[in-house]
Amino acid sequence: MLKNKLILALFASVVASSSHSQILKLDAVIDSIKSSHPVVKMYDNEIRSMDEAAKGARSWMPPQVGIGQFMTPYDVRLWHREGDIPGMGSVMVSGEQMFPNRKKLDADERYMKAMSSVEKERKNATLNELINDAKQFFYEWIILKKKLVILSENERILEFMIKNAEIRYRNGLEKISAYYKAKAALGDVKNMQLMFEADIREKRIRLNSLMGRNAMIEFDIDTTYLLSDYSALVFDSTLFYTNRSDLKSLNKEINLTLLKQETEKAALKPQFGIRYDNMIGFGGQPMQYTIMGMVRIPMAKWSSKMNKANIESLKWKTYAIQSQKEMMVNEYSGMAYGMRNELDLKKKQIKLYEENIIPALRNNYKTMQLGYEQNTEELFMLYDAWETLNMKQLEYVDLLNQALKLQVTIERIIEKN
C-alpha cells in the first residue's frame, strides 16, 4: 500500500513538474492560434456554408402543374350527352416548365462560387490581427522577465547594503540616512516584483485565450527574440497588394461585384418555356390538348429598369472599393515608413545603452562598491551609483520594449506572419 502511494506521489510530481516546465516558442503560439482559435472555425463554417449554397447555382425554376375544369357551363345538365349532342366542359390537366438561359446559369454559378473567396481573405486578415496581438503579449512577457532579472539583482544589492550598513552603524562607522533609503528602495523593488509577476499572469491568460485553451493553463515562454532589419524594404503598393489580406479581400470583392454585374446583364436575356394542357371532355367529347411555347422578354423597357439600375450601381460600387484600396495603401505606406524611422532610432539608442551607458555605470557601481568595502566611500554614494545604474537598466529595457512594439506594428502592417 505504501509502495503504491509512493508511486502515485512520484507520478503526480512528474506530471506537475512537466506541466509547469512547458516552454512555448512564439512559432508554437502562432500555430496554436491558426488551428484552435474559435474565429478560425467560425470563418471555416461560413466559407463552407457559401460553398454549399453555390452547389445550387444551376437550379431551374420548378415546374408548375395544375388541374381544374375548362370551359364548363354552370348548368350541370349540359355536362351530359343528349342523344347525338355531346356534353359540354372538360377537366384540364396542365403542366408548365421554363428553361433558364444558359448564360444566366453560368453567370450565377461563377458569382456564387466566388462568394467564399472574400471570406477566405477576411479570415486571413483577422488571423493577422490575432497573431500580432499574440506577438505583442509574447514580447511584453519577455520584457517583464528581463525586468524581474534586474529586480532580483537589485534585491541582492540592496540586501547587501542594508546588512553592511547595520553592521557599520552598530560599530559607529555609518550614518543612518542612506540606510533608510536602501530599506525603502528594497520595499519598492518587492512591490514592483509583485506587479510584474501579476502582469506575467495576465499575459499568460491572454495568450491561452488566443490559443483557444483554458485560460489558466500554466506555461512559460522562450525568451529568444530578434530585432528585424527593414531598412532595405520598400513599403509600396506592390508589397501591400501582395501581402495584406484585407486588400486581397477588396480585390475579391471587386471581382465579386463584376460577377454580380454579369448576373444582372444575363437576367436581361430572354427565357423560353413550354406549356402543355390536356383536356378530358364531358359527355362523350373527344380528348383535346394545347401545347404552347413561351418566352419571357425581360429586356423590355418597362421591365428592365431594375436590372439596368443595379448594373450602374455595381459599377460605382467597384469605383468606391478601388478608391478604398488606394486610400488604405497610402495610409499603410505612411505608417510603415514612420514606424521604421522610429525603430531605427530605438536600435541606435539600444546600442548606445548596451555598449556605452550601462557598462560605464556598472563599472562606476563596482568602483563605488569596492571603495565602500574598503571604507573609502560612503553608503549614500554607493546607493546613488546603484540608483543611477538601476534607472538606466530599466530605461534600456523600456527602449527594447518600444522597439519590439514598433516591430510588431510594422509586421502587422505588412502582414508578416
Regions found by a protein language model. Give the residues of each.
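Sec-dependent signal peptide cleavage junction
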Residues: 18-48, 201, 216, 226, ...
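Short segments within alpha-helical structural elements
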Residues: 188-213, 360-416
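Sec/SRP-type N-terminal targeting helices
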Residues: 41-45, 58, 99-127, 177, ...
